[in-house]
Amino acid sequence: MSGKDDYYNRAKQEGYRARSAYKLQQLDDTAGLLGEGRTVVDLGAAPGGWMQVAAERIGERGTLVGVDRQTIDDLEDPEPTVEYVRGDMTEDSTKDEIREIVGESDGSGGPVDVVISDMAPNMTGQYDLDHARSVHLVRQAFEVATDLLDAGGDFCAKVFDGQDLDDLIADIEPEFEYVREVRPDASRDSSSELYLVAKHRLTGPVREGDIVEATIEDIGEEGDGIAKVENFTVFVSGVEDGETVEVRIDDVKPRYAFAEPVE
């Protein structure tokens, strides 16, 4: 028996509902998605293997919401708060139900720390078609994620490799600090699946390369000027307190950015 098939037997022995549970374990070990106390939304959660792993890792202070068109059987004695939403993730009513569960954010983004998706299309055996359908599912999940994620939040979704992958990544990248491709060891050797891990949701009004006018309101401990762009903090090098200058955004983080004056 191959090591890949062995994951199926391990899942049965260890009480996981699907072998995909090990993929999420490996993704979390690699990318740090499921920290203690985080609020997690699992899209396309049935039968619940990813929910089992998420519940173990976010602990009693966490909140976990499983979303699927199918009924998800309740987890056995989970530590965190666990809720189930039966519905279409693209419908406003479904997103409203999620928000009712997790509440509103205190920050500039949504109320959720992590959105994960292991969804796959019904397979046709036609590689290009299956790839295109998987890309469409990721785009739908991405739309939900950008609506729900708080500043600094993370997004992880399965996609099949193919010709549209680069365009998909290019569309996701501006909304996060970075995006990487991860292929868990638990994926079958014959599978073209990979996971896009997008870290640190950006909700500020600026992006890398933007040129904006900034008034320096203070000087920080490191000597950089401190400006506000729509209440978003921008650190500007080589300026003095009280100056109003055009600056180019060099780097963007979830809660602040770095810039230099335009010469």
From Swiss-Prot:
One of its GO terms (molecular function) is rRNA (uridine-2'-O-)-methyltransferase activity. It is found in: Cytoplasm. Its EC number is 2.1.1.166. PROSITE patterns: TRAM. It comes from the Archaea. S-adenosyl-L-methionine binds at residues 48, 50, 68, 88, 118. Keywords: Cytoplasm, Methyltransferase, rRNA processing, S-adenosyl-L-methionine, Transferase. Specifically methylates the uridine in position 2552 of 23S rRNA at the 2'-O position of the ribose in the fully assembled 50S ribosomal subunit. Belongs to the class I-like SAM-binding methyltransferase superfamily. RNA methyltransferase RlmE family. This is Ribosomal RNA large subunit methyltransferase E. It comes from Haloarcula marismortui (strain ATCC 43049 / DSM 3752 / JCM 8966 / VKM B-1809). The lineage of its organism: Archaea, Methanobacteriati, Methanobacteriota, Stenosarchaea group, Halobacteria.
